Swiss-Prot record:
Residues 1082-1095 have a biased composition (Low complexity). The keyword Coiled coil applies. Residues 983-993, 1013-1057, 1068-1081, 1116-1130 have a biased composition (Basic and acidic residues). The keyword Coiled coil applies. This is Putative protein tag-278. Residues 121-779, 805-1061 form a coiled coil. Residues 1-92, 104-129, 974-1130 are annotated as: Disordered. It comes from Caenorhabditis elegans.
């Protein structure tokens, strides 16, 4: 089609010049200035050539008309030679041709008026029509000019918004990637440091173990020299050498593994750095090229706009002159105006029909909004129902607190739940706000659509067929270019997602390697410790069998009543231990069930969160996709209502499941309460047992009186039995000495292993703490709504059960200690029995300590809160330490008394004449010891009462601290018992030496023995002080490290802005999905309206503000057509 305003009829075909379609560098805008064919000037040429009156002579002007401005050569002279001529030139030629035609028409009208004077009316009408067409063309030129400027500004703003969105996308993703890489690097470095520290500790422990084994080996060689031959010693040495070589090989293998891990880590770091640098350079180059192209394009657009403005000014001046001349003939145009007014009335009727349709649509939207209000009211009713259910749960919790003694715990749990309910209410309010926002958006859309309808009504008058065809053509081109841009964006996002996948795979592989190494180390350490413990247990069982044989020999001579009572006591204790083990097994089973329920709840919460996120994304997509028409927005609202209903039904089902689970937990709580009552019955049986024990003590007192009566008879029989006793005593002392030596060595080994196991458990605890911290960082994203109800109730019940068990164990330990102290008073055979009970107690303590450590580790995994010390608890701890110190002093006094007994035994051997007097002194001392033991029993009962009060009054956090204090006290007592056993072994070993050295006086022997005892006491006190100082130093170091970490965290928070944590795996997968990539809801940076992307000043500002990490994962390959195509397409 021709672009000229001149008519392209059959008489003058030269005007309709076709021009070729040329690809331009500027953006193809849908409204470049082109004169519309409002009224064709077909009548102009005919009237000029043939007048109305009749045949006239042809004028010279009319002969020149077809060869002058109407020819195709002046309109488009370049079209025959070059295809690169712009539309601007064609438009200029069309305007010039219009002006020349008007000038020629006027001259011809003047000439015809001179020649044909009797026909002025037809010429005047023709001239008026020409003037009208010219004025209409001028007005439409001005309109099209404004349209062009508006479309160009809109296009410029769209390009700027696109570029801003793309920059915001890439900058956010690149920053997140860099932060993830840095976080992974820091995690890897921290884990490498912890792994190195563990390796160093493991090597130190190995060296210490080797040194201890060497020392023990030397001791065993000294013992075995008396028993075995040289050949057996050589075989043992060879075995130890082989074991030492094996341990050294393991050490070398661990070092090689450490070096290999360091090399792999360095290689991966180098690769990541090289990739990062290459991508940075490529992104910088691309960014600079794009900036240069945009600047060039900006200059070209400015030049074109200036040229066109000048041309428009010239045209307007010429047209204004013509309009002044043609104002005289406007009166005849009123008839045309009336016709146009009729047309306007018709169009107004059409507009009224459109307004009626709009009102119908508005009524439909109001109905939909009413439906939404009804749904919200239903939601409020369901919320009230949920609140009622919460109140019922609180009542049940209060009933449980009345049944149990832990009211304060459950009240704290209920307060936490109230906080969470408030959080849930806040979430519901947030959802309601979102609904209100959606409603406001729908209203704004209706307003926008109404304004668009008004604009369309104004535009309907000026739209023509040619404009519609050009618009369709240009819109097709714009759609093609948009599709190309979307395909490019999609390709860029795919590349970015591929790189993200690679980095995540590297990170996961590193994680798995570290976790596998840690697990292997744990398994090896556990196996080694279990093997050593089993070996020690076998040796202990052998020794216990030997001791039993000796005790049977001695018990045959003594009374049988005491043995029967002790057997009953042992049976009762064994039954109690069995019941406790059964309760432990049940509790572990219930803990497993609770863990399964927690996992299920976590899965359900994750599902609900995913659904909520999907709902939110779907609503945003639907709102953005259905902005064009109002009918589509109504459909979106209906879909959203259906989705909200489905979500609400899912929440109802989830609440029903919660209520069912809560009922199950209440049934379990009832069963646990019944079991607790059974345990209370067992405790009452124990109290009955204590009453039996008091009866036994009374019987012992009566027997002591009988012993006093028998003293006289014993004095008479001492002379006869002295010879027999010396022989028996010598044999028994030898056997006891050997057994005590063996027991001391085995007890030392057990203590070393116990210390080693504690160290390993501490290391395991640190590793578990690190793993728990990482898991907590992952789990903080998910909202913990229903977990706290179930987890806190179950934890409180399990803790109550564990505390009651520990308390019963401690009561049993105190009772066994009291029985030991009672048995110490009797005879040497009773002392052997005490050794057996000590061995049994140590086994029980080892098992108890292991179970306690397991419980503590589970509690540390489940609970992340740190318990603070109260001043009242510290005061009670100080009081207990004071009581423990008093007990230590009394034990020291007992040691002195035992030393005196040994001295008296030596004096009996050396001085047979003074035995009767010494035996009387010994009986007096024994009575004094009995009185002391009774006083100690009363003190211990007082301590037990205090412990019970503490257990009943304090909370779980205080119980833990008290248990730790009691464990420390038991360890100190065990150390004192070990020292007593060492002294007994030393004294037993020193007996054969004293027999050999009978020539030395008794005074010298006594001095040597006292000096040895003093040296050992000093060594023990020094060891204690060293251990306490080391513990204090370790605690101070830990406190300093914690303070430094907290200070570093605070500094990091102050320096760095509050940014969100690294996105979870679900968010990453959602970002990679193709549906997300096509959506336009990208986070755009807020920018002022005055900012112009085409100006070089603003572009330089953006270059300065942008960080170097923004160009990390941009395209590295250049497009072949990037230099040829214009800058606005980037």
């Amino acid at each position: 089609m021709s672009r000229s305003p001149r008519p392209h009829g059959t008489h003058e075909p030269a005007v309709g010049v076709t021009r070729p379609f040329v690809r331009q560098s500027h953006p193809e805008i849908a409204a470049w200035p082109a004169p519309p064919p409002a009224h064709q000037l077909g009548c102009l040429s005919g009237n000029v050539r043939t007048p109305v009156g009749g045949p006239a002579p042809p004028s010279p002007v009319l002969r020149r008309a077809p060869s002058g401005p109407i020819s195709p050569s002046p309109i488009s002279p370049v079209s025959q030679h070059s295809r690169a001529s712009s539309r601007h030139d064609i438009d200029n030629t069309s305007l010039l041709s219009i002006l020349k035609l008007s000038h020629v028409a006027r001259e011809s009208s003047r000439n015809t008026s001179r020649n044909n004077s009797p026909q002025p009316a037809g010429r005047e009408t023709e001239l008026k029509r020409k003037i009208q067409t010219l004025e209409e063309t001028v007005a439409e030129y001005e309109r099209q000019k404004y349209n062009v400027m508006g479309t160009f500004s809109e296009y410029r703003e769209r390009v700027a918004e696109r570029e801003r969105k793309l920059e915001a996308e890439y900058s956010g993703k690149i920053i997140a990637l860099s932060e993830e890489v840095l976080g992974a690097k820091k995690d890897f470095e921290a884990r490498m440091k912890s792994f190195q520290a563990l390796q160093d500790k493991f090597e130190r422990e190995k060296e210490q173990a080797l040194e201890k084994l060497r020392k023990e080996h030397q001791k065993e060689i000294q013992v075995l020299e008396q028993r075995f031959s040289d050949t057996q010693l050589l075989n043992l040495e060879q075995k130890y050498i082989i074991e030492i070589q094996r341990l050294e090989e393991e050490r070398k293998s661990l070092r090689t593994e450490k070096e290999r891990l360091g090399e792999t880590f360095e290689m991966k770091l180098r690769r990541a750095q090289s990739l990062y640098e290459t991508e940075l350079t490529a992104a910088k180059m691309l960014y600079t090229k794009e900036l240069e192209a945009l600047r060039d394009h900006e200059e070209a657009l400015k030049e074109e706009l200036l040229a066109r403005q000048d041309e428009f000014h010239d045209r307007l001046q010429e047209l204004q002159l013509q309009s002044k001349r043609s104002r005289e003939d406007l009166v005849s145009c009123k008839n045309d105006v009336t016709a146009l007014e009729k047309k306007l009335h018709n169009k107004e009727k059409e507009v009224q029909t459109l307004t009626k349709e709009l009102d119908q649509v508005k009524t439909e939207t109001n109905d939909k909004i009413r439906r939404l209000t009804e749904v919200t009211s239903e939601f409020a009713e369901y919320r009230k129902k949920f609140q009622q259910q919460e109140e019922e749960l609180r009542r049940k919790a209060r009933l449980l607190t009345v049944v149990e003694a832990a009211k304060e715990k459950l009240e704290s749990v209920i307060s936490d739940l109230q906080v969470e309910v408030k959080a849930l209410k806040n979430k519901v309010e947030f959802l309601e706000k979102e609904r209100e926002n959606l409603q406001s958006q729908s209203e704004s859309q209706t307003q926008l659509q109404s304004s668009q309808v008004d604009a369309l009504e104004a535009v309907l008058h000026s739209v023509t067929k040619e404009k519609e065809t050009t618009k369709e053509h240009y819109e097709g081109l714009l759609l093609k270019e948009r599709q190309q841009a979307e395909s490019r964006e999609h390709a860029m996002k795919k590349e970015f997602s591929c790189k993200l996948n690679e980095l995540e795979e590297q990170y996961t592989s590193l994680k798995e390697e570290l976790e596998e190494s840690a697990r292997l180390d744990k398994d090896e350490l556990r196996e080694a410790s279990e093997i050593e413990i089993q070996a020690l247990r076998t040796e202990k069982s052998i020794l216990a069998a030997e001791i039993r044989v000796l005790t049977q020999k001695i018990e045959d001579e003594e009374q049988d009543d005491i043995t029967e009572q002790l057997a009953k006591i042992v049976e009762d204790t064994s039954q109690l231990t069995r019941t406790l083990e059964e309760y432990r097994e049940r509790i572990t089973g219930k803990d497993a069930e609770i863990l399964n329920l927690r996992k299920q709840l976590e899965k359900e919460i994750s599902h609900t969160e995913d659904r909520n996120r999907l709902l939110h994304e779907n609503t945003q997509k639907e709102l953005e996709a259905h902005k064009e028409t109002h009918t589509e927005t109504v459909r979106v609202l209906e879909a959203e209502i259906d989705q909200f209903k489905s979500a609400f039904e899912n929440e109802q089902e989830y609440g029903k499941e919660k209520s069912a689970k809560i009922r199950e937990l209440e049934a379990q709580n009832k069963t646990l309460l019944s079991e607790m009552e059974k345990v209370k019955h067992v405790a009452e049986n124990l109290e009955a047992f204590t009453s039996d024990k008091d009866n036994l003590l009374e019987e012992l007192e009566s027997k002591n009186k009988n012993i006093e009566h028998l003293k006289q008879e014993i004095a008479q029989l001492n002379e006869k039995i002295s010879t027999k006793e010396t022989e028996k005593d010598s044999e028994l002392e030898k056997t006891i000495a050997q057994l005590e030596i063996d027991n001391s060595s085995k007890s030392d080994q057990i203590e070393k292993l116990h210390l080693r196991v504690n160290d390993m458990l501490d290391q395991m605890g640190t590793i578990k703490d690190e793993l728990v911290k990482k898991n907590e960082e992952i789990k903080t994203i998910s909202a913990k709504t229903a977990q706290l109800l179930e987890s806190n109730t179950v934890e409180s019940e399990t803790k109550l059960a564990s505390v009651t068990e520990e308390r019963e164990k401690e009561i049993q330990s105190f009772q066994t200690q009291i029985s030991e102290k009672d048995n110490e008073v009797l005879t040497k055979a009773e002392r052997i029995n005490e050794l057996e009970t000590c061995l049994k107690e140590r086994e029980v303590e080892l098992t108890g300590m292991r179970t306690k450590l397991d419980d503590m580790t589970q509690q540390l995994n489940e609970e992340t809160t740190v318990v603070l010390f109260d001043n009242s608890i510290q005061e009670k701890i100080d009081e207990k330490e004071a009581t423990i110190n008093e007990m230590n002093e009394r034990l020291k006094s007992r040691e002195n008394e035992i030393a005196k007994l040994h001295e008296e035994m030596y004096m009996q051997k050396t001085q047979n004449e003074k035995r009767n007097e010494e035996q009387s002194k010994l009986f007096q001392e024994l009575m004094f010891e009995k009185e002391q033991l009774e006083a100690e029993k009363a003190e211990q009962s007082h301590i037990e009462a205090e412990v019970e009060q503490v257990f009943q009054a304090d909370k779980e956090s205080k119980w833990k601290e008290q248990i730790e204090d009691l464990e420390n006290a038991l360890q100190r007592k065990n150390e004192l018992i070990q020292q007593l056993q060492d002294r007994q072994t030393d004294e037993s070993t020193s007996e054969p030496h004293t027999k050999k050295r009978m020539s030395i006086t008794s005074h010298g022997v006594f001095q040597n023995f006292v000096s040895q005892m003093k040296d050992k006491r000093e060594e023990a006190s020094e060891k204690r002080t060293r251990k306490e100082a080391e513990k204090k130093a370790e605690k101070e170091k830990e406190k300093a490290e914690k303070a430094a970490k907290e200070a570093a965290k605070e500094l990091a928070r102050e320096k760095s802005p509050a940014r969100a944590k690294s996105p979870s795996i679900l968010t990453r997968l959602r970002d990679r999905s193709p549906a997300k990539s096509k959506s336009d809801n990208l986070e755009s940076t807020p920018s002022s309206s005055s900012r112009n992307l085409l100006s070089p000043f603003d572009a330089e500002k953006r270059m300065e503000r942008s960080s170097p990490s923004q160009q990390l994962f941009s395209r590295t390959k250049k497009d072949s057509s990037s230099e040829k195509r214009p800058a606005w397409k980037f």
